[in-house]
């Protein structure tokens, strides 16, 4: 379906015959989150190439029945100017109107790039937006923004709308929609944005729900830039007790400072994974700590051995008070690493407690060869984290993985594969002593070579009464866009197109992590196009339609 709309868009904008692009008002509606705390959120982008038209007078916006109008503070119309005469791109904007990357400029439209034409407060079902904009000869860009009531909007609110008509030079015209109809805009919260708490970037989300229903979100706090280790990076944690609507002040459960007398940028900790021991209620964070390698890229700089002066350390810390406070991190590298390996660390995201009480994290290691060949597997503890074990890897050329327990107790490892194209999947019945390639491996779940999330939801823990696998990633083989949640009702044998929901089609960093907020609602923490770390809540019924 996506290819059809792209073809239509190109045909309408590029074809010199038939329906003329000139003087036609084209409308594009993108599937992106609406952040509750933002002053501006892009709802529609509009493009008008003026050859004869002189003025855009007004636009008429109609909201759908599902829209929570009482929670919308305002709707705005902006003029985005024109485009270079030499541009060959079929763009709908000359630049991003709101930045997700520029610290301090992540909440509102940058006035350097947009002219506010009209603002309607407390909108009704139909809104008339006055433009009265003299058209520049050639391309003209406009966009419509929506602002929610920050304290009243709910995570499960939605916005649906259409640009039903326009007036150009006093004449009524019908806009041409070049994107799919029926886009449902879902609410989100920017848990971490560029510049928050003095950090340039936040990456690598992990998410769990504690036994008390608290959400614990972990991530990299990348102070200087978005670069991977080695850099000045700590593990940050945000805590929510209201299902993700609000988040407490950031904590830093893992931070090594100037350990060993080295600068903070040579003591980075990153790529966190988090799990909750369902039997004890304790929460565990696993992370990699890099030390003694200057500021070179850790993937290529860590070497065989066991000492932190030579090789990266897999460290863990735990909380026994629902994530409020955390123990000092300790290294489990001596228990787990083969001294001949170069890099050994966890799979970022989350771990699990199996039905027999075993704690399991995904892991990965690299050989000390020219290509640093990676392998994914798992580590586990059968004494509530006192000691950890591992066996053999599932497959080579695989890295960031996530583990889930199937309905029969088998463990499934879903792996990022450096060969690209699709996820690798393997299963084990003995905690990784032996592995079996899954029938869907390298075929069922496409990927652009990126981290992904996989969780299992037992039948007695969801309102549908079915054992469900949920998977999220950029549903593409190019770029990191189209963040999608998919569901499988047969232990991952099939992933039906009807059982999925698209959350964000724009480009981002693409990592994600899933959890169940309650028996009806899925929570996702991900690197979106609108904030470094975004949280959304999605009802299961909006994902699964085949039942």
Feature-to-residue mapping (PLM):
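Boundary/junction segments of secreted and surface-exposed precursor proteins
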Residues: 21-33
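Tandem-repeat/low-complexity and Cys-motif detector
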Residues: 33-36, 66-67
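Short beta-strand elements of extracellular/lumenal beta-sandwich folds
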Residues: 38-64
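Asp-box/BNR beta-propeller blade signature and adjacent active/binding-site loops
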Residues: 40, 52-54, 82-84, 104-105, ...
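Bacterial Sec-dependent N-terminal signal peptides
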Residues: 1-22
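A generic structural signal for ordered secondary structure
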Residues: 6, 14, 43-47, 316, ...
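Disordered, low-complexity tails and leader-like regions
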Residues: 16, 21, 94-99, 379
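Extended intrinsically disordered, low-complexity coil regions enriched in Ser, Thr, Gly, Ala
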Residues: 54-56, 61-98, 102, 152-177
């Amino acid at each position: 379906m996506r290819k059809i709309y792209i073809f239509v868009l190109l045909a309408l904008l590029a074809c010199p015959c038939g329906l003329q692009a000139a003087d036609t008002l084209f409308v594009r509606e993108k599937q992106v989150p609406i952040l509750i705390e933002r002053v501006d959120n892009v709802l529609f982008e509009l493009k008008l190439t003026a050859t004869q038209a002189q003025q855009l007078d007004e636009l008429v916006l109609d909201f759908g029945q599902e829209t929570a109008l009482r929670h919308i503070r305002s709707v705005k119309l902006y003029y985005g100017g024109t485009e270079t005469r030499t541009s060959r791109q079929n763009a709908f904007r000359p630049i991003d109107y709101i930045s997700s990357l520029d610290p301090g400029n992540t909440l509102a439209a940058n006035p350097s790039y947009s002219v506010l034409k009209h603002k309607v407060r407390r909108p009704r079902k139909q809104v008339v937006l006055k433009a009265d904009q003299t058209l520049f000869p050639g391309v003209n860009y406009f966009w419509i923004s929506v602002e929610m009531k920050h304290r009243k909007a709910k995570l499960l609110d939605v916005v649906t709308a259409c640009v039903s008509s326009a007036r150009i030079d006093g004449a009524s015209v019908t806009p041409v929609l070049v994107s799919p109809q029926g886009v449902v805009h879902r609410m989100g919260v920017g848990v971490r944005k560029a510049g928050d708490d003095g950090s340039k970037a936040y990456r690598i989300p992990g998410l769990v729900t504690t036994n008390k229903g608290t959400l614990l979100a972990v991530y990299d706090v990348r102070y200087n830039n978005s670069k991977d280790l080695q850099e000045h990076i700590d593990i940050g944690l945000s805590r929510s007790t209201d299902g993700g609507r609000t988040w407490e002040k950031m904590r830093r459960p893992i931070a090594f400072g100037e350990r060993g007398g080295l600068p903070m940028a040579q003591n980075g900790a990153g790529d966190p994974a988090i799990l909750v021991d369902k039997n004890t209620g304790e929460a565990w964070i696993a992370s990699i700590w890099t030390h003694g390698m200057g500021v070179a890229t850790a993937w290529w700089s860590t070497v065989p051995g066991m000492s932190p002066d030579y090789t990266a350390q897999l460290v863990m810390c735990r909380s026994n008070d629902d994530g409020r406070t955390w123990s000092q991190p300790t290294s489990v590298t001596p228990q787990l690493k083969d001294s001949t390996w170069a890099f050994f660390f966890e799979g970022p995201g989350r771990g699990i407690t199996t039905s027999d009480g075993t704690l399991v994290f995904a892991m990965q290691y690299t050989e000390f060869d020219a290509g640093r060949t990676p392998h994914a597997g798992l580590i586990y503890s059968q004494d509530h984290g006192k000691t950890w074990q591992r066996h053999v890897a599932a497959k080579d050329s695989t890295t960031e993985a996530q583990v889930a327990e199937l309905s029969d107790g088998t463990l499934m490892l879903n792996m990022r594969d450096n060969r690209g194209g699709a996820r690798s999947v393997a299963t084990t019945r003995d905690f990784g002593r032996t592995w079996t390639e899954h029938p869907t491996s390298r075929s069922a779940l496409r990927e652009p070579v990126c981290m992904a999330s996989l969780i299992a939801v037992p039948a007695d823990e969801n309102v549908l009464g079915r054992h469900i696998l949920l998977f999220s990633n950029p549903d593409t083989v190019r770029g990191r866009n189209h963040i999608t949640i998919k569901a499988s009702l047969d232990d991952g044998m099939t992933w039906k197109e009807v059982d999925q929901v698209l959350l964000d089609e724009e480009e981002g960093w693409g990592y994600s992590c899933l959890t169940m907020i309650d028996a009806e609602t899925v929570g996702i923490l991900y690197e979106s196009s609108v904030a470094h770390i975004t949280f959304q809540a999605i009802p299961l019924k909006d994902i699964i339609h085949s039942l």
